[in-house]
A protein has these predicted regions:
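Beta-strand-loop-alpha-helix segment that lines the small-molecule cofactor/substrate pocket
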Residues: 1-43
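Contiguous beta-strand/loop segments that form the cofactor/metal-binding neighborhood of enzyme cores
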Residues: 107-166
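A short beta-to-alpha transition loop/helix N-cap that caps and shapes the active-site region
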Residues: 21, 74-79, 156-158
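Predominantly a Rossmann-like dinucleotide-binding segment in NAD(P)-dependent oxidoreductases
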Residues: 45-120
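Structured beta->alpha junctions
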Residues: 17, 43-46, 126, 152-154
Length: 166
């Protein structure tokens, strides 16, 4: 729908994540440029006053060594999936796995703060529909290790944390 609206000259604020894959994102960007409209992803957590404060004070922690973030929230639709009813939240055609729905909230701040990692390794649990129900991703940077956890099939109340040498 975003492409359709941009072709009609409309600016688009697109729900996160912007696209299901890089090919789709490139096409959306191409259409936005071609039509002289703004395409913006609605990922606002890294644009909040709290995040700006975090960035402002991050150096006070010294040399940063660890980033940890967790977003695990049992989906109200998971019980239906276990009963054999596939709702949008677990439909692979809509790219609605746990990473695309919740995991992005752990990864975006990491990439905004530290950029592209040197190496990434991941593990996850696929559900009957083929989407990921949960996962863990490790990101390796020059002097920092980062781990994110995400899930739509379990709850967690672990906080996010950035550790430095101070």
């Amino acid at each position: 729908l975003s492409i359709l609206f941009m072709q009609q000259g409309k600016h688009v604020l697109c729900e996160k994540p912007l696209a299901s894959n890089a090919k789709e994102a490139r096409e959306m960007i191409r259409v936005a440029r071609q039509n002289g409209v703004t395409l913006m992803e609605a990922m606002k957590s890294t644009l909040t006053p709290n995040f700006r404060q975090l960035r402002r004070h991050l150096a006070e922690a010294g040399c940063l060594r660890r980033y940890f973030a967790s977003y695990c929230q049992y989906s109200s639709r998971y019980d239906k999936l276990k009963a054999g009813i596939v709702l949008n939240a677990f439909n692979p055609e809509l790219s609605n796995g746990a990473m695309m729905d919740l995991g992005v909230y752990t990864v975006y701040p990491l990439v905004v703060l530290f950029g592209r990692p040197k190496r990434i390794s991941a593990t996850g649990l696929k559900l009957s529909t083929g989407v990921d129900g949960q996962g863990a991703v490790n990101f390796e940077y020059e002097n920092l290790n980062a781990t994110v956890l995400y899930s739509k099939i379990a709850d967690s109340f672990l906080p996010a944390e950035i550790q430095g040498e101070k």
